């Protein structure tokens, strides 16, 4: 009798959130999702300014990860991979964080601990996950993974990792609530300058694909959803003009007003205004350099790329 294939788990810890995906091999689907969870822990709080991880942020992350480990144990996970992205790449005291992850993840798989992955590997894993459900004839794809500290762009095997994300821009430029016009202009100038290195990638793209929380939240808002519904968000296609109408309205609101909307995660309400500036500049670049007019939103991303590599 053939033994059942092991259940696998992926954990992605970024600047703003830590997320879990548990999957098992399925004859029909290849990989069947058992659970997907998301917690806003703001691990990268202050890293852009201090160069160090805040001990309170590490503790918030530890508590969330311990909860994920309980879920993995309950579901019988045998293999886990945890990746840590922008915030830990930048931190002088990153070893405090890694020691914590080794202690917590070791309860599931001895020897497991978070890995810092390069921006290029992050982009490749995101690309594999984000494009899994899109018809191949819509390629070449440009996948944009907009995070808290960095944003990755990938077209095929070419990738660019940029030092701009919704937390980084909020802390560096957009500190008022709501942000002032001068703050927004400064953030926009930084994003526009950063995107110069991305322009050569975008020229060949036929479909723009957006993944991660800023894009998925903007999809829910653009569609006017009453609650966050992954099934309606995944593979939704947003016209640039509809999207930018929402982003400009978001920046006029306070964080508390954004938080009152049921589709906006409370932990994202204070940084999505900065995320909206990044989205607007990406949209302008995609329109100018590739003649595109819409973006496909994917609920699948780096987590799906990781579990595919484990199964």
Segments and roles (model prediction):
Residues 12-17, 144-150, 211-215, 300-302:
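A short acidic Gly-Thr/Ser loop motif
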Residues 16, 78, 293:
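Short acidic/polar active-site loop segments enriched in Thr and Asp
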Residues 13, 25, 146, 155-156:
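Generic beta-strand structural signal
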Residues 29-42, 69, 75:
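N-terminal glycine-rich anion-binding loops that anchor highly charged ligand groups
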Residues 2-32:
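N-terminal basic/disordered segments at the start of proteins
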Residues 3-8, 22, 46-70, 74, ...:
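Helical "lid/coupling" subdomains associated with nucleotide-phosphate turnover
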